[in-house]
Regions:
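Second-shell loop/turn segments in exported
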Residues: 132-137, 177-185, 200-205, 243, ...
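Extracytoplasmic/secreted envelope proteins and their assembly/folding machinery
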Residues: 143-145, 176, 188-196, 211-215, ...
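Entry/capping segment at the start of metal-dependent catalytic domains
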Residues: 50-155
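N-terminal targeting leaders characterized by basic, low-complexity, disordered sequences
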Residues: 1-51
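Extracytoplasmic
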Residues: 114-117, 141-146, 155-158, 163, ...
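Amphipathic, coiled-coil-like alpha-helical scaffolding segments used for oligomerization/assembly
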Residues: 180-242
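C-terminal solvent-exposed extensions
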Residues: 96, 129-130, 311-405
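Flexible, polar/acidic helix-loop-strand segments at domain edges
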Residues: 219-295
Length: 405
């Protein structure tokens, strides 16, 4: 499923299926006339470029890390080799449960390993408590939050764009619907197709997690350090959080990610909630990338019970190792899809600002921050958009702080 793409709001996803053309760096090494193997004192063969040699060394290092985590999984199991491999297969089966042919067909591979790729992250409002509740009996759980992430292993950079769940989208034969209805209409595969067309980019991977899974993952990491922007009092989200730098456990992290009514006085609560979700995800990424093999193994084990993804254990460890070195302070860009709220027949909808959306996605696809400025709400301390420019983000004292990038 190789593909190329054109970025644009509401653009149809049309992908070239031709075989990839090798990069120039894949060509044979070029030596000057008269040079002999002995005259080139390099640790790599004259038939291999230095870039390829370096890439191979990094690949070997990554394989060692993957092996270390797999060994850690064996230690966790404390069983024979056969039992350990069966255990890893069980984890893979848990991770891929519900990943059918339709879903894999909706995903589009990158041309080369290591290329930047898009991943759709979905948080559903399901939990064991809700499943057993009469209030939610028979309901299809909705994608309560969606983040379109661009991940670039080569430049160690991640861009997260939150998608407003109430965005009104034309879903063809299904009519005009809120974005979060896509999951209840056609599951993850349909949601991927809708978001891909809406954003004008191919989506290569996806992950879906519910409330319980999120809490378990954070707890498996031993909690995550987060600078909570403001005091949270939101019973609907689960309770109270103090403001300030602190280590959040799974329950506390979920409160921050769900808190919406705590921001009623500031305007669109969903926008602030999405910003906090990106804040927590950045903290999770920082913790995972600095984890030892045992902790990473425990996290994958915990995740596998609640997360659904096209990745397997090896994929997850390989991606984590390739992203080691990511500076989570400056290497993570973030923003939210630009929309305008409108009340229609008693229901609130978000209408995308198409020109701004197209410009944002063009910047994202070029590896640039989605916005040209940081946006920080000084009243709540919430970072609504980040360009990775931490130094400039505090240079303005207006109600919304900005820093041009």
């Amino acid at each position: 499923k190789h593909g190329q793409h054109t970025v644009g709001a509401q653009a149809s996803a049309s992908f070239d299926r031709e075989s990839p053309t090798p990069h120039a760096s894949h060509a044979a090494a070029s030596f000057g006339d008269g040079e002999t193997p002995g005259s080139v004192q390099n640790p790599y063969s004259r038939r291999v470029t230095q870039a390829e040699y370096t890439k191979k060394r990094k690949s070997k290092k990554r394989k060692k890390i993957v092996l270390a985590v797999c060994i850690a999984l064996l230690v966790v199991v404390l069983g024979g080799v056969g039992a350990a491999f069966a255990y890893i297969n069980t984890i893979n089966a848990n991770l891929n449960e519900g990943v059918d042919d339709d879903l894999r067909d909706a995903l589009v591979d990158t041309k080369y390993a290591g290329d930047p790729f898009y991943m759709l992250l979905m948080g559903t409002d399901g939990s064991e408590e809700r499943s057993e509740s009469a209030e939610y009996a028979g309901d299809q759980f909705r994608s309560d939050s969606m983040i379109l992430a661009r991940i670039d292993p080569q430049s160690k950079q991640v861009t997260m764009v939150s998608l407003h769940r109430d965005t009104l989208i034309d879903m063809g034969t299904n009519g005009k619907q809120k974005l979060n209805a896509a999951h209840s209409i056609g599951g993850a595969a349909y949601t991927i197709e809708v978001v891909s067309k809406f954003a004008g980019v191919p989506i290569s991977h996806y992950a879906e997690i519910d409330f319980d899974g999120f809490k378990e993952a954070v707890d498996a990491l031993g909690g995550v350090e987060v600078d909570v922007p403001m005091e949270i009092n939101d019973e609907d989200a689960g309770g109270h959080l103090d403001a300030g730098l602190q280590t959040l456990n799974g329950d506390q992290a979920l409160i921050l990610c769900r808190a919406r009514h705590a921001y009623d006085a500031y305007g669109d609560g969903d926008r602030y909630r999405a910003a906090n979700q990106r804040l927590v995800l950045s903290a999770v990424a920082k913790k995972i990338l600095s984890s030892d093999p045992i902790t990473m193994a425990n996290t994958i084990q915990a995740l596998s019970k609640y997360i659904t993804t096209d990745f397997n254990v090896t994929d997850i460890v390989s991606l984590a190792s390739s992203m080691q070195g990511l500076n989570t302070d400056t290497g993570i860009y973030s923003a939210m899809e630009p929309t305008t709220s409108k009340l229609v027949n008693g229901t609130w909808y978000e209408y995308v600002n198409e020109k701004e959306w197209q410009t944002m996605m063009q910047r994202v696809d070029q590896g640039l921050p989605p916005t040209t400025e940081d946006e920080i709400d000084e009243k709540s301390g919430t970072v609504l958009a980040s360009t990775g420019d931490k130094a400039g983000a505090t240079s303005n004292t207006s109600s919304t702080t900005t820093a041009t990038r």
